[in-house]
Amino acid sequence: MSRKYFGTDGVRGKVGDFPITPDFAMKLGWAAGTVLASTGTKEVLIGKDTRISGYMLESAMEAGFSAAGVNVALIGPMPTPAVAYLASTFRADAGVVISASHNPFYDNGIKFFSNSGTKLNDAQELEIEALLEKALNQNAMQCVASEKLGKVRRIDDAAGRYIEFCKGTFPNHLSLAGLKIVVDSAHGAAYHIAPNVYRELGAEVISINDKPNGVNINDHCGATHLDSLQTAVMVHEADLGIALDGDADRVMFVDHNGHVVDGDEILFILAQAAHSKGEMTGGVVGTLMSNLGLELALKQMDIPFVRAKVGDRYVVEQLKHTGWQLGGEGSGHILSLQHASTGDGIVASLQVLKAVLESQKSLSEIKAGMTKLPQVLINVRLATADADSILATTSVQQAVIKAEEFLGDQGRVLLRKSGTEPLIRVMVESTDNVMTQTQAEYIADAVRAA
């Protein structure tokens, strides 16, 4: 049975449009609270990023949880991985994140973590959706008895707890002293956390895009817009730059030359560092979108590589299935399960900094062992949300077949719908730049015409 509301990363959409409305959020809180209250401590944590709509949705979810008899602990603006960690340490039934990650401010979303710090499984989400449907369509939402209503409290030391957790993943014998780092927090949830983590570990930090006003989150900054970070690294003659997205679950780097180091290259750096010390256990999990250059570079070190479906939840599932610990996406979602239960931009960045220090080389030098193959990704925005019917059209399928025949064994094609936006993503990868671009545009034109 497929999920109706939960996409690859929870519920997400434009604020004010269903389902990102106060009414939906309240009923979702009630449905989730009813399911969670049947087994656990009857307490949830709610964190959010810096979007102005977070206040509205937070209050609505509070009401829903309270109506279900579940207590709520509010931790304010907080990175998504911090909510996953704190839900576990506070022994809550679940953590709730109100965020649309790297999306613009006018979008928002809601996702859940279990008390073990992982995403809810499909079965739990289906159970919540079944109750939610009744609340939305049959007016089935009912309060518990007055004396059993949930209470709400604020936790003031959540940021400090998470900062110490992040620092604890970095070896005690190492220091960032002597490193000049530019940190771009995307005017997002880590604006008051990330710079302090690196400073407290000894780095000289230049912090940019750290003044959220509710509407500037991810606005030409952060992990999806690296221009300002590249400029700042060059202007300040920094050793490197670190960019997080709005909820700090993904990270990208810029080396001292101003060149981008993406998630695929980060995975290579971490695998290479572990391999050089004889500490690489198992292999690496990427996704269908991972650059073929990563797979080839890992193969040179005899490190196994498998591809999961796109979405960090599926990378986690594949890691658990294989028993491996390292995985991620080119977009900067990095999973290092020996350190964190979910993708954590700050924690992943610290592991890269560890690799830089231990190698006694620059970031630019330690990424040089991987050569990225030309990869073109075209996002075709849809007028309607019916991506499945477009993907099923004969003209689109024939375009893919022709492109694959043209590329042969020198490349690959991937066509998929976005789990978070009304987009179809066209990805083509091959050994030749011109061939890659031409075939990607050919397929994208077929999608637009469908």
Swiss-Prot record:
Keywords: Isomerase, Magnesium, Metal-binding, Phosphoprotein. GO terms for molecular function: magnesium ion binding; phosphoglucosamine mutase activity; phosphomannomutase activity. GO terms for cellular component: cytosol. InterPro entries: A-D-PHexomutase_a/b/a-I, A-D-PHexomutase_a/b/a-I/II/III, A-D-PHexomutase_a/b/a-II, A-D-PHexomutase_a/b/a-III, A-D-PHexomutase_C, A-D-PHexomutase_C_sf, A-D-PHexomutase_CS, Alpha-D-phosphohexomutase_SF. Gene3D superfamilies: Alpha-D-Glucose-1,6-Bisphosphate, subunit A, domain 3, Alpha-D-phosphohexomutase, C-terminal domain. It catalyses: alpha-D-glucosamine 1-phosphate = D-glucosamine 6-phosphate. It is an enzyme of class 5 (isomerase). Its EC number is 5.4.2.10. The active site is at residue 101. The keyword Transferase does not apply. Binds 1 Mg(2+) ion per subunit. One of its GO terms (biological process) is peptidoglycan biosynthetic process. Mg(2+) binds at residues 101, 245, 247, 249. The modification Phosphoserine is found at residue 101. This is Phosphoglucosamine mutase 2. It comes from Shewanella baltica (strain OS195). The gene is glmM2.
